[in-house]
Amino acid sequence: MSNTALTPFVITREFRAPRALLWQVQTQAEHLHHWLSPEGFHTIHANMDFRVGGRYHYGLEGPNGMQMWGLQQFLEIVPERKIVHLQSFSDKDGGLGRHPMAPTWPAYMHVTATYEDSASGGTLYTIAWQPHESDAEGVASFDGARAGMNAGFAGTFAKLDAYLLTLQS
């Protein structure tokens, strides 16, 4: 199924960090575990092969030992400018998994992230998500989750802001 008529979920945020630093903390596994997780979760596995055709496989553990696994498959990389990848839930071995709390969630999300210098010396970061080859039920699940995605990204970006400050102090 094509999702070309679907409005992507887009969020833009200015970070008070140079583009090179923001790129580094988003493309190196040793940085990602400091900030890339929902509130209350921590990273238990991070394996990064950051190149076109490569992937990032990660595991998170949250309250009561709940685990979530994910996989990013890199489609396009323009250093310090753009990353395009397919995002999916996975199992601990890197095979395709399903959203643990939303069984109708699309199997794959097409994600485009861009990085631009801001007038204030920071970085303007924009990320766009949309279902990739999803059925109507998956698209409806995605559309119904926009408020939650806004809240989730706000929390994750707050953690990223704090981490960037520690690196620059």
Question: Could you say what each language-model-derived stretch is?
Answer:
Residues 22, 32, 56, 74, ...:
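Hydrophobic pocket/interface hotspot
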Residues 21-25, 94, 159:
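Glycine-rich, low-complexity intrinsically disordered segments
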Residues 60, 87, 127-129:
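Residue-level recognition of conserved beta-strand positions in structured domain cores
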Residues 46-50, 57, 64-120, 162:
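Hydrophobic-ligand binding "helix-grip"
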Residues 95-151:
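Beta-strand/loop substructures that line and gate deep hydrophobic ligand-binding cavities in soluble
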Residues 1-43:
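Hydrophobic ligand-binding cavity/cleft-lining segments
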Residues 10, 30-73, 168:
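Short beta-edge strand/loop motif at the mouth of beta-sheet-based domains
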